[in-house]
Curated annotation (Swiss-Prot):
This is Thyroid hormone receptor beta. Keywords: DNA-binding, Metal-binding, Nucleus, Receptor, Transcription, Transcription regulation, Zinc, Zinc-finger. Composed of three domains: a modulating N-terminal domain, a DNA-binding domain and a C-terminal ligand-binding domain. Induction: By thyroid hormone. Nuclear hormone receptor that can act as a repressor or activator of transcription. High affinity receptor for thyroid hormones, including triiodothyronine and thyroxine. 3,3',5-triiodo-L-thyronine 1 binds at H347. GO terms for molecular function: nuclear receptor activity; RNA polymerase II cis-regulatory region sequence-specific DNA binding; thyroid hormone binding; zinc ion binding. SMART domains: HOLI, ZnF_C4. Residues 1-18 are annotated as: Modulating. A zinc finger (NR C4-type) spans 19-39, 57-81. Residues 129-373 form the NR LBD domain. 3,3',5-triiodo-L-thyronine binds at R194, N243. L-thyroxine binds at R194, N243, H347.
Amino acid sequence: MPSSMSGYIPSYLDKDELCVVCGDKATGYHYRCITCEGCKGFFRRTIQKNLHPSYSCKYEGKCVIDKVTRNQCQECRFKKCIAVGMATDLVLDDSKRLAKRKLIEENREKRRKDELQKTLVQKPEPTPEEWELIQVVTEAHVATNAQGSHWKQKRKFLPEDIGQAPIVNAPEGGKVDLEAFSQFTKIITPAITRVVDFAKKLPMFCELPCEDQIILLKGCCMEIMSLRAAVRYDPESETLTLNGEMAVTRGQLKNGGLGVVSDAIFDLGVSLSSFNLDDTEVALLQAVLLMSSDRPGLSSVERIEKCQEGFLLAFEHYINYRKHNVAHFWPKLLMKVTDLRMIGACHASRFLHMKVECPTELFPPLFLEVFED
């Protein structure tokens, strides 16, 4: 049976439907009859307080009850309520009414919690269009990621005597070990080339103006190379593998030119090792870094921002699909984007130091082209 619905006009009422007791505008189905709020309240109070025995009519019970006269004769009004079919047994006493109200509130709260739980459990997964985007980005990464999943078998450890010992009488990371630096420069050109190739496999990147492409690549190159190294951190040997081939220790990377930046990359590697990222997640991180609309000098800011938003949404939905067993996985992973941006900024200032410390002929042309302003 429909319950009382005061406060709004229910959809089951016809437009301008009238109260069967007094003819005023009806508000709903009350105590088995279509009535107005006034007659509903009058009938409820009469029954709850047992007032009807005290009602008396001055005109022999023959009053006409309408919205003007309804308050003039309580007896005739009550008799009409009974005559049209209002049910006394449906009127609750105060204790039952409070219990019913409490039950309604509890049910409402339960529905609210159920809806919230449903939202939490049923996190959206990628749409068909997002799956297409995810596939493009993943294939771009796999095609440009040196050694792929076989990096552990293919890597070669940089000899321990290179770049391992701290430079005498120099602040930590202050001096550059030129032998280690020259080893790193051998792999820097192919590493940069792979980042460029990754970007060029993304249609949305290739559609941007050439000048914007250059700005985006110069901005993200160190960040993406650092990410690719960090996800190849090996806790057993405590090394990172650069460009999928050269395994180096923290000290070697530091003394070979990166200084304190090496600590940030190694710390990121240690942290990411617990995330168990797959190729798609690494690829999407790279795409988010690439499409950073806050790089100075860009002309297509809104377009790039829209691209990044598309990557982020697909990324979040993919994380939902993967169902990582880590609390707050998505926000924690997004923090790594901030860490990588910081690494890129630190490397920019470190590069100036390397220019002072290392002979110009040791710098590969592509290295200078990307990192010089």
